[in-house]
């Protein structure tokens, strides 16, 4: 199979899966928006924000599991892929149980950052307390999706995402309008979809294992302390890297809020364009992760180098296409997100930054995938940490005189630094991944 076909076999379903990610929240929002009071809508906005931050921090479960599984699968160690799945699920269930146990302090901490009325806060708490019971399922699904992707299967996660969203729509509408449960019906429909999605993913994973005669045993999962150490090391670096990402994105919004509601809204609209780019680039990053990890496990250095070239050819082409679309049709795209004249005018005055975002950000996205596939997660952390320091330093220097332009320049510099720092490390990581000692370890 050519590198281009291997990339597209993972990237296209992954992009479609990525597009479905916000749908669970959109469905809740759309249903709540027709319940007769804005309090329900505001409560879901707050609850969704709290869960978004929480689950983003634990995305390492998907990435770490995916990279390690891809390498084990590439070296035909099917028993090890089974143990990786079991270790990941044990950690996911443990974290999920901890989140449930700590829901009250976590809820109070999250709400301390929100400015809202008492009725909205009451509804947000009720919504949160229902959906927190989906934490073990959501985190387990991260592990299962990463594991399936590591085995070069991107279609099953897409199928699960579609089933989840259809079930969420149907169950939420039934509970809200059929049983009159209002906000609790919205939460209940989402909770049901989360658990069914996890159960469905587990079914497909176990079916895959049975085909290869691999059955993970709990005792075997605990026996190899070295494997646990490796699993935790890979994931700790991803977790710290995610903290840096969240800090930058949160600060971008916070810094923009100081410029008033119009610029804050304009920045939010332009970031939606960046989100669209990220869904596509992440799909190709997943391909780099899955195919790259598989080639590391198989010891195919020449094919890995061809994979890198093919990935960047796709990335460069698509990023330039996005830039052209934003440059030529940016005004129309902005109008899709808002009809507020002041916000549209402000967003259009900063449109150049959205045009520059795709090519500047492209390397960071693709290298993330390759670094996960080679389990070089310390390099990912270094790249994002250096870039984050650059963002805060540049913003401090430029914002006092350039205002919102300074914020966007700092953000572009952050994205560029991510790619540059990680790109500088790539040759060393490739040599290390395919060194004789590494190949012996993989096999």
Language-model features and meaning:
Residues 9-28, 130, 134, 141, ...:
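Transmembrane helical elements of multi-pass membrane transporters/channels
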Residues 41-101, 138-157, 266-324, 328-330, ...:
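Small-residue-rich hydrophobic transmembrane alpha-helices
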């Amino acid at each position: 199979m050519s590198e281009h076909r291997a990339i597209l076999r993972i990237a296209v379903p992954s992009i479609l899966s990525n597009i479905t990610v916000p749908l669970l929240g959109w469905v809740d929002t759309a249903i709540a928006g027709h319940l007769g009071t804005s309090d329900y809508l505001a409560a879901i906005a707050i609850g969704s924000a709290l869960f978004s931050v929480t689950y983003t921090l634990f995305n390492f479960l998907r990435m770490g599991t995916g990279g390690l599984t891809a390498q084990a699968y590439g070296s035909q160690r099917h028993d090890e892929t089974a143990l990786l799945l079991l270790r990941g699920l044990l950690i996911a269930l443990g974290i999920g149980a901890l989140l449930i146990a700590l829901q009250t302090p976590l809820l109070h901490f999250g709400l301390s950052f929100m400015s809202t009325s008492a009725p909205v806060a009451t509804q947000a708490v009720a919504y949160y307390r229902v959906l927190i019971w989906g934490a073990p399922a959501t985190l387990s699904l991260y592990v299962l999706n990463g594991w399936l992707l590591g085995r070069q299967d991107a279609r099953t996660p897409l199928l699960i995402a579609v089933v989840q969203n259809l079930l969420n729509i149907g169950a939420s509408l039934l509970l809200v309008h059929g049983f009159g449960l209002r906000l609790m019906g919205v939460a209940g429909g989402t909770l049901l979809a989360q658990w069914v999605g996890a159960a469905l993913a587990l079914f497909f994973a176990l079916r895959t294992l049975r085909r290869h005669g691999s059955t993970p045993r709990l005792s075997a999962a605990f026996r190899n302390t070295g494997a646990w150490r490796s699993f935790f090391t890979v994931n700790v670096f991803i977790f710290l890297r995610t903290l840096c990402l969240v800090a930058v994105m949160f600060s971008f919004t916070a810094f923009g809020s100081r410029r008033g509601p119009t610029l804050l809204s304009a920045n939010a609209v332009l970031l939606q364009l960046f989100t669209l780019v990220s869904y596509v680039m992440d799909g190709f990053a997943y391909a780099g992760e899955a195919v790259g990890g598989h080639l590391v496990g198989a010891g195919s250095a020449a094919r890995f180098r061809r994979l890198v070239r093919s990935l960047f050819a796709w990335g460069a082409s698509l990023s330039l296409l996005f830039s052209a679309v934003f440059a030529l049709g940016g005004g129309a795209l902005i109008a899709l997100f808002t009809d507020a004249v002041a916000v549209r005018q402000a967003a259009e005055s900063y449109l150049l930054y959205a045009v520059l975002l795709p090519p500047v950000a492209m390397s960071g996205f693709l290298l993330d995938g390759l670094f996960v596939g080679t389990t070089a997660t310390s390099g990912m952390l270094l790249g994002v940490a250096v870039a984050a320091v650059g963002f805060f330093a540049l913003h401090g220097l430029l914002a006092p005189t350039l205002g919102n332009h300074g914020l966007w320049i700092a953000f572009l510099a952050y994205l560029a630094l991510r790619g540059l720092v990680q790109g500088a490390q790539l040759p060393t990581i490739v040599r290390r991944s395919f060194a004789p000692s590494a190949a012996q370890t993989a096999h």
